[in-house]
Amino acid sequence: MKSIHRHPLVSIHHKKLSPFVKYGWGYRPSGLKAKKSGGQYALYEDPSVRSLKPGYGGAVYGITFDSRGVMFDASGESDLIDALQGDIEVEAATPAIMERYRALGISKYNWSLPSDVSSFEEGVLIIDQSRGDASIKYGGLDYSDFIRMFDDALAENPNSPIYIKTHPDRAFRRKKSCFSGKQLSHPRVQILPADLSPADCFKLCKKVYVGTSLMGMEALIHGCEVVTYGWNSYAGWGLTTDRGREPLPPRARQHSLIELFQAAYINYS
């Protein structure tokens, strides 16, 4: 808890809260404790545009605050999901902001320099995640879904190269993949360079298979077809093909991409 309070952005926001509000980080022990406190609580999480590199120690660009849950909770307990159940008013500047985001290749992590992908053949992208990540547990996923995702990508795209984008934590923090060694070494599969940015991945892959990774939302912003296998904030609004095993959390309406960007990147972050 002390480490959370030392976070400069948390510290600034916490000073504005009632002293009776309990707070914690996402669904880590501090956040779960705050949520179970029986009173008002605030949960902090990484935003859609976080930092240069993943992990701890680097400068962080922003933070999200949620009075109900986290945006990757399949139960739908989140201020973001609650807002998306209603109308989203798109501000006049938002289309230009989204276009600028796309043109600059901005992502959650921004450590990669632009790369020349002309030597790659256009193909299909599978997005890996870090084994044990909270969005897997709370996003209605288990590891059998990564097997389904992998098998579907190969079966549905028999003539296309299959690329896998591993999570940056695999390079920076030695986190394990959600795919087996056999899958990663499959003859039709190529592991993309760790320092290839999401924006460059989307230049060579216009179809993307994803669990709950935020790269799925980034793929939508870059105009890709997105197939999901878990329930994150961008699934279920009519923009994605959804194959999650768990029942879809209630979605009261559909949204355009610009409405989703307004809600997730402007209002919530």
Where would I find each of the regions flagged by the language model?
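Catalytic-core helical/loop segments in enzymes performing group transfer/polymerization on anionic/lipid-linked
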Residues: M1-S269
